[in-house]
């Protein structure tokens, strides 16, 4: 079996060597969910830190829930700064998912001022300014981006679990608002809640337009 590459500080280190010390890794979760916000986190790690301090951190999808929770706490202890931002279902419907994701990232980054450079998972986003480096599969190769993915995932999952008590029947405690079979059946039987994304195809196709819970 081929071992997956671990996120490292190679990209951060190259910037630190140039005197660029406040480097924020940014990532988001929840883009494809049918309910709940899209959430972004931004993490600034200390320059020249020992990567062994966060050696178990991976892209959040590669970790079990308990591991994510433990590492999210450790990340907050080690990091110079951590910011979380979100954009609601209503904002997603009004703006579209891309613009709402950018908004969530901007809100997360606003909590970290000053920032000298951004490391971003995926493609460049002009809205975040010129001082950025976009990395394909950045959450697999950059430790600060991977850390951001863990923080964002833990924050969003906790929110969806709290909403599961407020809106029972949709299985948000386990599906986090994603379109599982259980969730789609609940939509047909119960209708959408105020936390559902009405602009997403499965919701737009529903004839039921109100929540009766």
From Swiss-Prot:
The keyword Transmembrane helix does not apply. GO terms for cellular component: cytoplasm; ribonuclease H2 complex. The keyword DNA-binding does not apply. It is found in: Cytoplasm. Manganese or magnesium. Binds 1 divalent metal ion per monomer in the absence of substrate. May bind a second metal ion after substrate binding. Residues 21-212 form the RNase H type-2 domain. Its EC number is 3.1.26.4. A divalent metal cation binds at residues 27-28, 121. This is Ribonuclease HII. It comes from Synechococcus sp. (strain JA-2-3B'a(2-13)).
């Amino acid at each position: 079996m081929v071992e997956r590459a671990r996120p490292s500080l190679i990209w951060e280190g190259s910037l630190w060597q140039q005197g660029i010390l406040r480097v924020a890794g940014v990532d988001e979760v929840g883009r494809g969910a049918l309910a709940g916000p899209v959430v972004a986190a931004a993490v600034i790690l200390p320059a020249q830190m020992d990567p062994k301090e966060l050696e178990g951190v991976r892209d959040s999808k590669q970790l079990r829930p308990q591991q994510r929770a433990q590492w999210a706490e450790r990340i907050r202890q080690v990091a110079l700064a951590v910011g979380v931002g979100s954009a609601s279902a209503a904002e997603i419907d009004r703006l579209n998912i891309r613009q709402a994701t950018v908004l969530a990232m901007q809100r997360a980054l606003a909590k970290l001022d000053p920032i000298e450079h951004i490391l971003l998972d995926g493609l460049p986003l002009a809205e975040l300014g010129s001082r950025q480096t976009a990395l394909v599969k950045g959450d697999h190769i950059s430790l600060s981006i991977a850390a951001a993915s863990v923080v964002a995932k833990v924050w969003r999952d906790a929110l969806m679990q709290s909403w599961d008590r407020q809106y029972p029947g949709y299985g948000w405690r386990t599906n986090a608002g994603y379109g599982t079979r259980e969730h789609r059946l609940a939509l047909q039987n119960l209708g959408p809640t105020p936390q559902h994304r009405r602009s997403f195809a499965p919701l737009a196709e529903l004839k039921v337009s109100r929540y009766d819970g």
